[in-house]
């Protein structure tokens, strides 16, 4: 929760890897390694998790899924301790996340003989859940002077920051818009007033944090080791209902 001022931090259930991520970032602070290297590390961890799933090595798969979550936090932490924020890193991180999520659900669908549409809508639901969490979280960060490399509305290509190339930012932003645009539009359509409403209380944000990718991967890892892989796709299909429940709660109790 280092992206928020102390007085506005909440318990983020998806951010369990942050303490280890900070240790990794501080260890790498004065080395040649960059946040991009750490992002590549979590991509490798994600593919190792997929390989272990295919080999029915579910404990190992769970380990690599959690390692992926930790490294996913560590790249941002490293950018902060090196004081080198980057749109390149921000969009590469997001593009890598959605591609790995797609491959993970394809793999789970293959292992459980799930039909194509169930697999697709479970993946779609997972992304929609994550988008709602990121939407509320980004609004909170921008309101209280937290990290602003993520914007509430990703409508225009940002200007490259010091140390990065505009062509890289432009390319990755284009990929980001292509992959995430539909989810952003759906969530904004469902709750367009959120940005101008009063601040959501910490307890509500903690509840919504179950939609954070770290918590979602933890659930998948847990279901794999518990022998519940056949329930992963149905779970994320049903869990998408909570998107509408959370939005209804926010509009009812925390609107202006």
What are these regions (language model features)?
Residues 35-88, 104-105, 121-124:
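Membrane-embedded alpha-helical segments that form the functional core of polytopic membrane enzymes
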Residues 23, 27, 73, 77, ...:
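Membrane-spanning helices that line or support transport/gating and their immediate boundary helices
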Residues 109-140:
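Alpha-helical transmembrane segments
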């Amino acid at each position: 929760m280092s992206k928020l001022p102390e007085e506005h931090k909440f318990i983020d259930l998806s951010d369990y890897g942050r303490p280890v991520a900070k240790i990794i970032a501080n260890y790498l602070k004065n080395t040649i390694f960059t946040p991009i290297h750490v992002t590549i590390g979590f991509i490798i961890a994600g593919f190792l998790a997929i390989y272990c799933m295919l080999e029915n090595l579910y404990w190992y798969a769970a380990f690599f899924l959690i390692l992926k979550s930790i490294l996913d936090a560590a790249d941002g932490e490293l950018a902060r301790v090196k004081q080198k924020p980057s749109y390149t890193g921000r969009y590469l991180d997001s593009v890598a996340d959605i591609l790995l999520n797609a491959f993970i659900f394809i793999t789970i669908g293959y292992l459980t003989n799930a039909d194509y549409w169930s697999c697709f809508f479970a993946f779609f639901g997972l992304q929609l859940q994550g988008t709602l969490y990121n939407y509320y979280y980004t609004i909170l960060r921008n309101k209280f002077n937290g990290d602003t490399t993520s914007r509430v509305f990703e409508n225009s290509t940002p200007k490259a920051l010091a140390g990065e190339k505009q062509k890289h930012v432009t390319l990755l932003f284009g990929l980001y818009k292509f992959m995430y645009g539909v989810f952003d539009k759906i969530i904004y359509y469902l709750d367009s007033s959120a940005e101008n409403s009063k601040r959501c209380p910490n307890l509500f944000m903690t509840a919504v944090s179950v939609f954070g990718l770290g918590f979602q991967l933890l659930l998948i890892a847990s279901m794999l080791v518990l022998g519940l892989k056949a329930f992963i796709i149905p779970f994320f299909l049903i869990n998408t209902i909570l998107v509408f429940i959370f939005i209804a709660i926010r509009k009812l109790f925390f609107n202006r």
